Amino acid sequence: MAALAASIATSTAFAAKPRLSRPPARLSVSCSASSGDNNNSTATPSLSASIKTFSAALALSSVLLSSAATSPPPAAADIAGLTPCKESKAFAKREKQSVKKLNSSLKKYAPDSAPALAIQATIDKTKRRFENYGKFGLLCGSDGLPHLIVSGDQRHWGEFITPGVLFLYIAGWIGWVGRSYLIAVSGEKKPAMREIIIDVELAARIIPRGFIWPVAAYRELINGDLVVDDADIGY
């Protein structure tokens, strides 16, 4: 009886162990299956979204390339924001408006009258000015007006450097002639009257000397005659 009871207890113990081990096995299988389903369901929408994004980007690039190939390139220059005047639509429009305004004024006068001839000369001068702006490569802005480039670029020296040097030369010539005239009349009895009433004969002799004012100024600077002492200046 004791042996029979022991065998029954042993068989009961062995029979209970599989019952306890089955549920964890089933739980693990079910978890792995659900995880796989979630991954598949998540991967499918992301893949379709990537395909749609790539297709949209490809279509957009095709449209941009086709438009760039068919449309002519815009007129551009070496300075940002500026366009060569001969290629600027705003510049051509401004020229057309200027000539049109002068032509409307020309119609008010007889063909051979003095005002008509003066207006016609102005029209010719206006056309020539706009033509020169385009011929010499000036750059225009969005307003259609030429812009001077003062950055020191050698390609645009003719727009600013050359006129600037010419202006300084003319201004120096005028100043040197005036200085020479004041020095010439300073030794007279009433120099102030010579400043008010200009001696034309004396001024006519001094004016031609002013054309070499850079050389004359350098010579006086070397000799010490260009600047006077403070003691010789009257207050």
From Swiss-Prot:
State what protein this is by name: Photosystem I reaction center subunit III, chloroplastic
Signal peptide, first to last residue? none
Family that this chain belongs to? Belongs to the PsaF family.
What keywords tag this UniProt record? Chloroplast, Photosynthesis, Photosystem I, Plastid, Thylakoid, Transit peptide
Record GO biological process: photosynthesis
Q: Where exactly is the transit peptide annotated in this entry?
A: 1-77
Output the InterPro entries linked to this UniProt entry: PSI_PsaF, PSI_PsaF_sf
Q: Where in the cell is it found?
A: Plastid, Chloroplast thylakoid lumen
GO cellular component terms given for this protein = chloroplast thylakoid lumen; chloroplast thylakoid membrane; photosystem I reaction center
Q: Does the keyword Glycoprotein apply?
A: no
What does this chain do? Probably participates in efficiency of electron transfer from plastocyanin to P700 (or cytochrome c553 in algae and cyanobacteria). This plastocyanin-docking protein contributes to the specific association of plastocyanin to PSI.
Q: The organism's lineage?
A: Eukaryota, Viridiplantae, Streptophyta, Embryophyta, Tracheophyta
* Gene (UniProt): PSAF
Q: Which Pfam families match?
A: PSI_PsaF
SUPFAM superfamilies referenced in this protein's UniProt entry, alphabetically: Subunit III of photosystem I reaction centre, PsaF
